[in-house]
């Protein structure tokens, strides 16, 4: 039972870190990346469809993306979705090809994005600490119901703390990496 609590806590912490990575992938750096457009949805065939399901996205040169729409009739919808996104990009449409030129980030915008990245990192740390709190509470509940001894509680809490420290260190590394990527001109 104790191992199950630890495993559950570790799984939840890993999911939090993965969610942070996915979230930070949509933060625009100076370089073009297809993951930048992951959050864009197109009204297609009666539902909201992710852009990567109606078009292929590739990097052309260092600062531009080329979107090749599979269905020619979808080009206008894709263009509208890009305008509607908060990425601040202007698409150039030529038939089924859509070109996105990413302007270089200003120093001010880089600092704003660094703050956003730092804030997301802090939110993830809070989530990890909440997972630790939940796991420790489950361990204490087991003690109350006399399923485990005090020594096992202490050992379980130490193990959960080690998992937490490792997860928070991982969050710090992800945030630091993204901040360096942002500040690189």
Curated annotation (Swiss-Prot):
Query: Which InterPro entries does the protein's record reference?
Result: Ribosome_recyc_fac (IPR002661), Ribosome_recyc_fac_dom (IPR023584), RRF_sf (IPR036191)
- Write out the GO biological process terms: cytoplasmic translational termination
Determine the domain of life of the protein's source.
Bacteria
Can you supply one Gene Ontology CC term for this chain's record? cytosol
Enumerate the UniProt keywords alphabetically. Answer: Cytoplasm, Protein biosynthesis
Do you know which Gene3D superfamilies this protein is assigned to? 3.30.1360.40, Ribosome-recycling factor
CDD domains attached here?
RRF
The record ties this protein, via Pfam families, to:
RRF
Query: Would the keyword Cytoplasm turn up in this protein's UniProt record?
Result: yes
Q: Which SUPFAM superfamilies match?
A: Ribosome recycling factor, RRF
Cellular localization per UniProt: Cytoplasm
Provide a Gene Ontology MF annotation, just one.
ribosomal large subunit binding
Q: Which family does it belong to?
A: Belongs to the RRF family.
Q: Which HAMAP family match?
A: RRF
NCBIfam families referenced in this protein's UniProt entry, alphabetically: frr
Q: What is this protein's function?
A: Responsible for the release of ribosomes from messenger RNA at the termination of protein biosynthesis. May increase the efficiency of translation by recycling ribosomes from one round of translation to another.
Name listed for the protein in its UniProt record: Ribosome-recycling factor
* This protein's encoding gene: frr
């Amino acid at each position: 039972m104790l191992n199950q609590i630890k495993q559950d806590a570790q799984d939840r912490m890993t999911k939090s870190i993965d969610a942070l990575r996915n979230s930070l992938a949509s933060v625009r750096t100076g370089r073009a990346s297809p993951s930048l457009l992951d959050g864009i949805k197109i009204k297609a065939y009666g539902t909201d469809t992710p852009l990567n399901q109606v078009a292929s996205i590739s990097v052309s040169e260092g600062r531009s993306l080329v979107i090749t729409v599979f269905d020619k009739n979808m080009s206008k919808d894709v263009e509208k979705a890009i305008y509607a996104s908060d990425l601040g990009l202007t698409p150039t449409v030529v038939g089924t090809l859509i070109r996105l030129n990413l302007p270089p980030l200003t120093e001010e915008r880089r600092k704003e994005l660094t703050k956003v990245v730092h804030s997301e990192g802090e939110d993830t740390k809070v989530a990890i600490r909440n997972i630790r709190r939940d796991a420790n509470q489950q361990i204490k509940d087991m003690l109350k119901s006399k399923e485990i001894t005090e020594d096992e509680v202490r050992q379980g809490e130490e193990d959960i703390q080690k998992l937490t420290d490792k997860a928070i260190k991982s969050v710090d590394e992800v945030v630091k990496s993204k901040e360096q990527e942002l500040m690189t001109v």
